[in-house]
Amino acid sequence: MLRVGRVYESSFHHNAVFVGMDEKENPKYAAIRGIGTSFIGEANGSDKNYSFSIFTEKPQDTVHLFESAIDLLSYATLQKLEGKEWRREHLLSLAGVYQPAKEIEKSKVPAALVRTLKMHPEVKTIVLHLDNDRIGRLATKAISAVLPKQYQVKDVPPKQGKDYNDLLCIKLNLAITKREKSAKKSMSGHENMRDRR
């Protein structure tokens, strides 16, 4: 991921940047996360249809869905630590918390998942790895309810902690980073980022 520019450290504020690409490997989305801070943002003009993902080169019938790029990469790391080949299945982040409608049946399938299912018609199973909090559980319920019945949906939240990054930290005996609730910010340029810090 680092070698191909999908994940990098921004030079100005030293934030982690997770890049979502289109089919021609053009950047279309960038999630920005503070390193050692609770900062969360995304680049102006980001298209959530192209959120951070890792797709297999060969057709695969399963897609794993996460709230964030960090959870996706934490899951991949856990798979690797367990001796499993994490590159054998499609991995997709939602670029943040999914907000279902008040009436769950009126919710929509997340844009990134709609695009992925169109790109990969061979997918039959969707594994939801959303957070172990009220919002994550509600999102799981809503997505499960609105997905077409042709898909098998599995709910596999982390066994410990709030999310897969917490689970990875627990497995590695690392401190879990405290996250403050803060408004998500959209960034365009260095000056804009400086003003928001």
Protein language model regions, located:
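Short active-site oxyanion
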Residues: 59-63, 125-126
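Conserved Rossmann-like nucleotide-cofactor binding loop
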Residues: 71
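TOPRIM fold recognition
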Residues: 79-197
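Short pre-functional
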Residues: 18-20, 63-66
